[in-house]
Amino acid sequence: MEKPGGFWIPKKSNKESSWEELAFAEDDAAGSLWPPRSYTCSFCRREFKSAQALGGHMNVHRRDRARLKQADDQYLFPKSSSSPEYPSHKDSDNIHETSCYTLVFNTKPNYFKTQHSCVIDLSSSSSLPYLTPSRVSSGLPGKQHTSSSPPSFVVEPSKNSKYIPSSSPWSCPSTVVEQKSCDLYEIPAMEGEKKRKTESDVPKIGHKAKLSLGNTTDLSVSMNLVIHQSFPITAHGSDEEIGRVDIRKRRRRHESPSQQSIFISSLSCKSDIITRNEESKHKGDRFEDLDLELRLGTDPPKGI
Protein backbone atom coordinates (compact mmCIF):
# COMPACT_ATOMS: atom_id res chain seq x y z
CA MET A 1 0.00 0.00 0.00
CA GLU A 2 1.37 3.40 -0.95
CA LYS A 3 0.41 6.71 0.58
CA PRO A 4 0.54 10.07 -1.29
CA GLY A 5 3.91 10.78 0.31
CA GLY A 6 5.46 7.74 -1.33
CA PHE A 7 6.00 5.66 1.86
CA TRP A 8 5.20 1.95 2.01
CA ILE A 9 3.22 0.67 5.03
CA PRO A 10 3.23 -3.09 5.38
CA LYS A 11 -0.14 -4.72 6.03
CA LYS A 12 -0.42 -6.48 9.38
CA SER A 13 -1.46 -10.07 9.43
CA ASN A 14 -4.04 -11.57 11.77
CA LYS A 15 -1.32 -12.97 14.01
CA GLU A 16 0.30 -9.57 14.57
CA SER A 17 -2.99 -7.76 15.44
CA SER A 18 -3.87 -7.13 19.10
CA TRP A 19 -6.20 -9.37 21.08
CA GLU A 20 -8.75 -6.58 21.38
CA GLU A 21 -9.03 -6.18 17.64
CA LEU A 22 -9.38 -9.91 17.23
CA ALA A 23 -12.10 -10.09 19.88
CA PHE A 24 -14.21 -7.37 18.31
CA ALA A 25 -13.68 -8.92 14.88
CA GLU A 26 -14.98 -12.25 16.12
CA ASP A 27 -17.93 -10.49 17.75
CA ASP A 28 -18.82 -8.87 14.46
CA ALA A 29 -18.51 -12.20 12.73
CA ALA A 30 -21.05 -13.79 15.17
CA GLY A 31 -18.33 -15.69 16.93
CA SER A 32 -17.56 -15.62 20.64
CA LEU A 33 -19.16 -12.74 22.56
CA TRP A 34 -16.51 -10.55 24.11
CA PRO A 35 -16.94 -8.17 25.83
CA PRO A 36 -20.32 -9.47 27.02
CA ARG A 37 -23.27 -7.67 25.42
CA SER A 38 -25.88 -8.83 27.94
CA TYR A 39 -26.32 -7.17 31.37
CA THR A 40 -28.47 -8.90 34.00
CA CYS A 41 -30.26 -7.24 36.95
CA SER A 42 -29.26 -8.81 40.25
CA PHE A 43 -32.77 -8.29 41.74
CA CYS A 44 -35.19 -9.45 39.04
CA ARG A 45 -32.70 -11.27 36.75
CA ARG A 46 -33.78 -9.19 33.78
CA GLU A 47 -31.30 -8.86 30.90
CA PHE A 48 -30.34 -5.61 29.17
CA LYS A 49 -28.19 -4.95 26.12
CA SER A 50 -26.37 -1.87 27.48
CA ALA A 51 -25.00 -0.69 30.79
CA GLN A 52 -27.02 2.53 30.59
CA ALA A 53 -30.29 0.61 30.43
CA LEU A 54 -29.27 -1.50 33.39
CA GLY A 55 -28.37 1.63 35.39
CA GLY A 56 -31.80 3.17 34.80
CA HIS A 57 -33.44 -0.08 35.83
CA MET A 58 -31.41 -0.16 39.06
CA ASN A 59 -32.58 3.37 39.91
CA VAL A 60 -36.15 2.06 39.90
CA HIS A 61 -35.16 -0.63 42.39
CA ARG A 62 -33.47 1.99 44.63
CA ARG A 63 -36.62 4.13 44.73
CA ASP A 64 -38.73 1.13 45.65
CA ARG A 65 -36.39 0.20 48.48
CA ALA A 66 -36.44 3.79 49.81
CA ARG A 67 -40.25 3.79 49.84
CA LEU A 68 -40.36 0.49 51.70
CA LYS A 69 -37.91 1.78 54.29
CA GLN A 70 -39.93 4.96 54.82
CA ALA A 71 -43.11 2.92 55.27
CA ASP A 72 -41.39 0.75 57.88
CA ASP A 73 -40.23 3.84 59.80
CA GLN A 74 -43.75 5.28 59.83
CA TYR A 75 -45.13 1.97 61.09
CA LEU A 76 -42.59 1.78 63.93
CA PHE A 77 -42.86 5.50 64.83
CA PRO A 78 -46.40 6.59 63.90
CA LYS A 79 -46.37 9.89 65.86
CA SER A 80 -43.59 12.47 65.67
CA SER A 81 -43.05 15.08 68.39
CA SER A 82 -42.53 17.90 65.88
CA SER A 83 -46.05 17.88 64.40
CA PRO A 84 -48.69 19.47 66.71
CA GLU A 85 -52.06 17.82 67.25
CA TYR A 86 -55.40 19.55 67.56
CA PRO A 87 -58.28 18.73 69.92
CA SER A 88 -61.32 16.73 68.92
CA HIS A 89 -63.70 18.51 71.39
CA LYS A 90 -65.60 15.30 72.20
CA ASP A 91 -67.24 14.54 75.57
CA SER A 92 -65.61 11.23 76.42
CA ASP A 93 -63.82 9.77 79.40
CA ASN A 94 -60.37 10.29 77.93
CA ILE A 95 -60.00 13.79 76.49
CA HIS A 96 -56.67 14.29 74.71
CA GLU A 97 -55.48 17.79 73.88
CA THR A 98 -51.91 18.82 73.18
CA SER A 99 -51.78 22.62 72.90
CA CYS A 100 -53.40 25.92 73.94
CA TYR A 101 -56.75 26.85 72.44
CA THR A 102 -59.66 29.21 72.97
CA LEU A 103 -61.22 29.61 76.39
CA VAL A 104 -63.64 26.73 76.98
CA PHE A 105 -65.71 26.07 80.08
CA ASN A 106 -65.08 22.81 81.87
CA THR A 107 -68.13 20.58 82.16
CA LYS A 108 -66.36 17.84 84.11
CA PRO A 109 -64.39 19.28 87.04
CA ASN A 110 -63.36 15.80 88.23
CA TYR A 111 -60.62 15.79 85.64
CA PHE A 112 -58.72 18.61 87.37
CA LYS A 113 -55.27 17.47 88.45
CA THR A 114 -52.70 20.17 87.94
CA GLN A 115 -52.70 23.35 85.93
CA HIS A 116 -50.50 25.59 83.82
CA SER A 117 -51.03 29.31 83.46
CA CYS A 118 -51.08 30.99 80.06
CA VAL A 119 -50.74 34.76 79.62
CA ILE A 120 -52.50 36.68 76.84
CA ASP A 121 -51.69 40.32 76.14
CA LEU A 122 -54.83 42.47 76.17
CA SER A 123 -53.10 45.65 74.98
CA SER A 124 -53.17 44.58 71.33
CA SER A 125 -56.49 44.72 69.50
CA SER A 126 -55.82 41.50 67.61
CA SER A 127 -55.87 39.31 70.72
CA LEU A 128 -59.04 40.75 72.32
CA PRO A 129 -61.88 39.25 70.22
CA TYR A 130 -60.17 35.94 69.50
CA LEU A 131 -57.79 34.25 71.92
CA THR A 132 -55.52 32.72 69.33
CA PRO A 133 -52.65 30.36 70.25
CA SER A 134 -50.11 32.70 68.62
CA ARG A 135 -50.52 35.19 71.49
CA VAL A 136 -50.53 32.50 74.20
CA SER A 137 -47.43 31.51 76.14
CA SER A 138 -47.32 28.75 78.69
CA GLY A 139 -46.45 29.31 82.28
CA LEU A 140 -45.78 26.98 85.18
CA PRO A 141 -48.01 24.63 87.19
CA GLY A 142 -49.81 26.23 90.09
CA LYS A 143 -52.18 25.14 92.82
CA GLN A 144 -54.57 22.24 92.41
CA HIS A 145 -58.34 22.54 92.06
CA THR A 146 -60.98 20.48 93.79
CA SER A 147 -63.91 18.85 92.04
CA SER A 148 -66.38 21.48 93.33
CA SER A 149 -64.57 24.51 91.93
CA PRO A 150 -66.51 26.16 89.05
CA PRO A 151 -64.81 27.14 85.78
CA SER A 152 -63.68 30.75 85.55
CA PHE A 153 -60.93 33.05 84.27
CA VAL A 154 -58.28 35.22 85.88
CA VAL A 155 -57.67 38.85 84.94
CA GLU A 156 -54.71 40.40 86.66
CA PRO A 157 -52.50 43.45 85.96
CA SER A 158 -48.98 43.24 84.61
CA LYS A 159 -45.98 45.49 85.02
CA ASN A 160 -45.33 45.79 81.31
CA SER A 161 -48.09 44.88 78.89
CA LYS A 162 -45.71 44.43 75.96
CA TYR A 163 -43.75 41.74 77.75
CA ILE A 164 -45.10 38.21 77.87
CA PRO A 165 -43.14 36.04 80.37
CA SER A 166 -42.27 33.10 78.19
CA SER A 167 -39.45 31.78 76.04
CA SER A 168 -41.54 31.41 72.88
CA PRO A 169 -45.00 32.58 71.74
CA TRP A 170 -46.11 28.95 71.27
CA SER A 171 -44.50 27.03 74.07
CA CYS A 172 -47.31 24.91 75.49
CA PRO A 173 -46.01 21.37 76.08
CA SER A 174 -47.23 18.67 73.72
CA THR A 175 -48.42 16.36 76.49
CA VAL A 176 -51.86 14.90 77.18
CA VAL A 177 -54.30 17.43 78.64
CA GLU A 178 -57.19 16.29 80.79
CA GLN A 179 -59.31 19.46 81.04
CA LYS A 180 -59.03 23.24 81.37
CA SER A 181 -59.90 25.19 84.52
CA CYS A 182 -59.77 28.89 85.31
CA ASP A 183 -60.59 31.32 88.13
CA LEU A 184 -61.89 34.85 87.49
CA TYR A 185 -60.59 37.65 89.61
CA GLU A 186 -60.70 41.25 88.50
CA ILE A 187 -58.14 43.55 90.06
CA PRO A 188 -58.89 47.21 89.24
CA ALA A 189 -57.23 49.63 91.69
CA MET A 190 -60.02 52.15 92.32
CA GLU A 191 -58.16 54.26 94.89
CA GLY A 192 -58.45 51.46 97.45
CA GLU A 193 -62.28 51.48 97.45
CA LYS A 194 -63.09 48.35 95.46
CA LYS A 195 -61.69 44.93 96.24
CA ARG A 196 -61.11 41.83 94.19
CA LYS A 197 -64.27 40.35 92.66
CA THR A 198 -64.88 36.65 93.11
CA GLU A 199 -65.78 34.14 90.46
CA SER A 200 -69.51 34.83 90.95
CA ASP A 201 -69.31 37.33 88.05
CA VAL A 202 -68.67 34.51 85.58
CA PRO A 203 -71.60 32.60 84.05
CA LYS A 204 -71.55 28.97 85.14
CA ILE A 205 -73.51 27.58 82.16
CA GLY A 206 -72.15 27.46 78.64
CA HIS A 207 -69.42 25.90 76.56
CA LYS A 208 -67.40 28.98 75.60
CA ALA A 209 -66.44 31.87 77.79
CA LYS A 210 -67.52 35.41 76.90
CA LEU A 211 -65.32 38.00 78.58
CA SER A 212 -67.23 41.14 79.56
CA LEU A 213 -64.47 43.73 79.63
CA GLY A 214 -66.86 46.65 80.29
CA ASN A 215 -65.00 49.90 80.96
CA THR A 216 -61.60 48.26 81.19
CA THR A 217 -60.53 49.39 77.70
CA ASP A 218 -58.57 52.30 79.17
CA LEU A 219 -56.80 49.95 81.53
CA SER A 220 -56.05 47.29 78.92
CA VAL A 221 -52.59 48.74 78.37
CA SER A 222 -51.49 47.52 81.77
CA MET A 223 -53.55 44.35 82.10
CA ASN A 224 -52.95 40.77 81.08
CA LEU A 225 -55.36 37.87 80.93
CA VAL A 226 -54.11 34.80 82.75
CA ILE A 227 -55.64 31.47 81.77
CA HIS A 228 -55.00 28.54 84.08
CA GLN A 229 -54.86 25.31 82.11
CA SER A 230 -54.42 21.80 83.46
CA PHE A 231 -51.49 19.65 82.34
CA PRO A 232 -50.12 16.47 83.96
CA ILE A 233 -46.67 16.96 85.44
CA THR A 234 -44.03 14.73 83.91
CA ALA A 235 -41.74 12.74 86.15
CA HIS A 236 -38.47 14.07 84.74
CA GLY A 237 -39.23 17.80 85.17
CA SER A 238 -41.08 17.96 88.50
CA ASP A 239 -38.22 19.37 90.62
CA GLU A 240 -37.31 22.02 88.08
CA GLU A 241 -40.93 23.14 87.67
CA ILE A 242 -41.40 23.44 91.44
CA GLY A 243 -38.36 25.72 91.63
CA ARG A 244 -39.73 27.88 88.85
CA VAL A 245 -43.07 28.19 90.66
CA ASP A 246 -41.33 29.57 93.76
CA ILE A 247 -39.39 32.12 91.69
CA ARG A 248 -42.54 33.23 89.91
CA LYS A 249 -44.47 33.68 93.19
CA ARG A 250 -41.68 35.88 94.55
CA ARG A 251 -41.73 38.03 91.42
CA ARG A 252 -45.48 38.52 91.70
CA ARG A 253 -45.16 39.64 95.33
CA HIS A 254 -42.52 42.21 94.41
CA GLU A 255 -44.41 43.46 91.35
CA SER A 256 -47.85 43.89 92.98
CA PRO A 257 -47.35 47.44 94.48
CA SER A 258 -45.89 48.80 91.26
CA GLN A 259 -48.78 47.34 89.27
CA GLN A 260 -51.35 49.03 91.51
CA SER A 261 -49.49 52.33 91.21
CA ILE A 262 -49.81 52.12 87.43
CA PHE A 263 -53.59 51.74 87.75
CA ILE A 264 -53.83 54.62 90.21
CA SER A 265 -51.77 56.90 87.99
CA SER A 266 -53.91 56.13 84.94
CA LEU A 267 -57.12 56.77 86.89
CA SER A 268 -55.77 60.01 88.36
CA CYS A 269 -54.90 61.27 84.88
CA LYS A 270 -58.41 60.48 83.73
CA SER A 271 -59.95 62.35 86.69
CA ASP A 272 -57.76 65.41 85.99
CA ILE A 273 -58.99 65.51 82.40
CA ILE A 274 -62.62 65.37 83.58
CA THR A 275 -62.14 68.24 86.08
CA ARG A 276 -60.44 70.38 83.43
CA ASN A 277 -63.33 69.83 81.03
CA GLU A 278 -65.82 70.86 83.71
CA GLU A 279 -63.85 74.03 84.55
CA SER A 280 -63.60 75.05 80.91
CA LYS A 281 -67.33 74.46 80.44
CA HIS A 282 -68.14 76.60 83.49
CA LYS A 283 -65.93 79.43 82.23
CA GLY A 284 -67.59 79.22 78.82
CA ASP A 285 -71.02 79.69 80.42
CA ARG A 286 -69.74 82.79 82.28
CA PHE A 287 -68.41 84.37 79.09
CA GLU A 288 -71.72 83.72 77.32
CA ASP A 289 -73.61 85.54 80.12
CA LEU A 290 -71.17 88.45 79.89
CA ASP A 291 -71.59 88.72 76.13
CA LEU A 292 -75.39 88.73 76.46
CA GLU A 293 -75.31 91.49 79.09
CA LEU A 294 -73.00 93.64 76.96
CA ARG A 295 -75.40 93.36 74.04
CA LEU A 296 -78.37 94.39 76.19
CA GLY A 297 -76.45 97.31 77.68
CA THR A 298 -76.59 96.20 81.29
CA ASP A 299 -73.65 96.38 83.67
CA PRO A 300 -71.61 93.20 83.93
CA PRO A 301 -71.53 91.48 87.34
CA LYS A 302 -68.67 92.43 89.63
CA GLY A 303 -67.63 88.87 90.36
CA ILE A 304 -66.23 88.31 86.87
From Swiss-Prot:
Where in this protein does the record put region Disordered? 71-91, 135-157
Q: Where is the composition biased (Low complexity)?
A: 147-157
UniProt keyword annotation of Kinase present: no
Q: Where in the cell is it found?
A: Nucleus
Residues crossing the lipid bilayer are none
What else is on record for this protein?
A: Plants over-expressing ZFP10 show are dwarf, have abnormal leaf morphology, flower early and are sterile.
What the protein does comes down to: Probable transcription factor that may regulate cell division and growth.
Protein name listed in UniProt: Zinc finger protein 10
